Amino acid sequence: MFEDLKPHLQELRKRLMVSVGTILVAFLGCFHFWKSIFEFVKNSYKGTLIQLSPIEGVMVAVKISFSAAIVISMPIIFWQLWLFIAPGLYKNEKKVILPFVFFGSGMFLIGAAFSYYVVFPFIIEYLATFGSDVFAANISASSYVSFFTRLILGFGVAFELPVLAYFLAKVGLITDASLKAYFKYAIVVIFIVAAIITPPDVVSQIFMALPLVGLYGLSILIAKMVNPAPKDNENNNENNNENNTKENTKSES
């Protein structure tokens, strides 16, 4: 059994090494420009960030550089993921490789951009000013960056749902009917996932869950277009059965 899995494990190791190597190279490049990236990250917050420990500045630079490296490396990561999956697919299923890489990377960037320009400014402003009449908001640079990266990467991953639906529908694993049937269960799962990948506050979870519900609806439409239910065939079969029944009745008469 292990001998059968060995080639797959070796292939997985190869793809992981390429992905990790890409992230590492991107990290080194981003670390050189971490101050510029930090200014971009801080642009959504007009307040002052503080440093609570001597090592905090280094940790902030590492966090920012690593997060930026992941975003930059997404096309390569999707490409390596596809190269690992592709050998187990049929020839016609492999035709989705370019849409998978292109739309996978694109939807990740759209999710990150949606979080940066729409969600994050509102959430940070709300949380920073909540209770401002009782205490002063002194946000550390490290906690701010952690909050920012978790939200940005979380939305980037969440926006992959339509891409996943397209891929699964293309290989025939799901249909729009199956997604509709599990809709109420999906809502529960969506709120659980939102609670896991977002910072621990209700506002962030709601802002994550609502777009996910919309993306689930979009996934239903995508599955319907890619792998539609064979209604025409069913209607044709019903008509044929009716015609056969009528012919049999006439013959008996």
Swiss-Prot record:
Segments crossing the lipid bilayer: 18-38, 69-89, 96-116, 151-171, 187-207, 208-228
Signal peptide: none
Location (main, coarse): membrane
Entry's localization field: Cell inner membrane
Start-end of Basic and acidic residues biased regions: 244-253
Disordered: annotated span: 231-253
GO BP, sorted A to Z: intracellular protein transmembrane transport; protein transport by the Tat complex
Gene Ontology CC entries for this record: TAT protein transport complex
Keywords annotated in UniProt: Cell inner membrane, Cell membrane, Membrane, Protein transport, Translocation, Transmembrane, Transmembrane helix, Transport
Keyword Transferase part of the UniProt annotation: no
Any GO molecular function: proton motive force dependent protein transmembrane transporter activity
Bilayer topology annotation: Multi-pass membrane protein
Matches recorded under InterPro entries: Sec-indep_translocase_CS, TatC
The family this protein is said to belong to: Belongs to the TatC family.
Protein role: Part of the twin-arginine translocation (Tat) system that transports large folded proteins containing a characteristic twin-arginine motif in their signal peptide across membranes. Together with TatB, TatC is part of a receptor directly interacting with Tat signal peptides.
Assembly information from the UniProt record: The Tat system comprises two distinct complexes: a TatABC complex, containing multiple copies of TatA, TatB and TatC subunits, and a separate TatA complex, containing only TatA subunits. Substrates initially bind to the TatABC complex, which probably triggers association of the separate TatA complex to form the active translocon.
Name of the protein this chain belongs to: Sec-independent protein translocase protein TatC
Source organism: Helicobacter pylori (strain ATCC 700392 / 26695) (Campylobacter pylori)
